[in-house]
């Protein structure tokens, strides 16, 4: 597991990175995470989040455009534990999560807007690996994302921590 410091990455790569608007909180067991972006667009339905958590995710971060909904949780403890088991570096969710006490103990990076106790409906609706935009940034599958307690940044190419 790599450790990232987003202010240091911003200082080292000012012309490469885009910084997300500061609306996310760190809920995961990892205080920093980063990797290749896999995108998902869904609204109050986490069926595809669960499907992706079942896939191998080494070196990858699932970026979920949940439309900013504050009415349902797109991630809970069971899906988070499955994602960690399958090697995902983390998730950045433009929406809510639940089971925050368990997720805080899970070896997974999780950034989201807030917690909400209500689960989603399961309709199987959503789009995988599409370009999504939220928090002032456009996310493209195959680009890179880095997150810590300072914020979340995106780069078109992988970044290395400065010496």
From Swiss-Prot:
Sorted UniProt keywords: Lyase, Metal-binding
Assigned EC number: 4.1.3.17, 4.1.1.112
Domain of life: Bacteria
Keyword Metal-binding assigned: yes
Residues annotated as binding a divalent metal cation: 99
Cofactor: a divalent metal cation
Family matches, as InterPro entries: RraA, RraA/RraA-like, RraA/RraA-like_sf
Free-text comment on the cofactor: Divalent metal cation.
Any GO BP annotation: regulation of RNA metabolic process
Catalytic activity, as annotated: 4-hydroxy-4-methyl-2-oxoglutarate = 2 pyruvate; oxaloacetate + H(+) = pyruvate + CO2
GO MF annotations in UniProt: 4-hydroxy-4-methyl-2-oxoglutarate aldolase activity; metal ion binding; oxaloacetate decarboxylase activity; ribonuclease inhibitor activity
List of residues binding substrate: 76-79, 98
UniProt cross-references to Gene3D superfamilies, sorted A to Z: Ribonuclease E inhibitor RraA/RraA-like
Family as reported in the entry's similarity comment: Belongs to the class II aldolase/RraA-like family.
Function: Catalyzes the aldol cleavage of 4-hydroxy-4-methyl-2-oxoglutarate (HMG) into 2 molecules of pyruvate. Also contains a secondary oxaloacetate (OAA) decarboxylase activity due to the common pyruvate enolate transition state formed following C-C bond cleavage in the retro-aldol and decarboxylation reactions.
Subunit annotation: Homotrimer.
Protein name: Putative 4-hydroxy-4-methyl-2-oxoglutarate aldolase
């Amino acid at each position: 597991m790599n450790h990232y410091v987003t202010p240091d990455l911003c200082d080292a790569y000012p012309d490469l990175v885009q910084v997300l608007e500061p609306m996310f909180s760190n809920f995961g067991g990892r205080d920093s995470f980063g990797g290749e972006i896999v995108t998902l667009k869904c609204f109050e339905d986490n069926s595809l989040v669960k499907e992706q958590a079942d896939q191998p995710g080494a070196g990858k971060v699932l970026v979920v455009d949940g439309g900013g909904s504050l009415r349902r949780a797109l991630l809970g403890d069971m899906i988070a534990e499955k994602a960690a088991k399958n090697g995902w570096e983390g998730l950045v969710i433009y929406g809510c999560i639940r089971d925050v006490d368990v997720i805080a103990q899970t070896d997974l990076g999780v950034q989201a807007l807030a917690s909400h106790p209500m689960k989603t409906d399961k309709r199987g609706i959503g789009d995988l690996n599409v370009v999504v935009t939220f928090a002032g940034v456009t996310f493209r599958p195959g680009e890179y994302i880095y997150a810590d307690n300072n914020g979340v940044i995106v780069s078109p190419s992988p970044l290395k921590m400065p010496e």
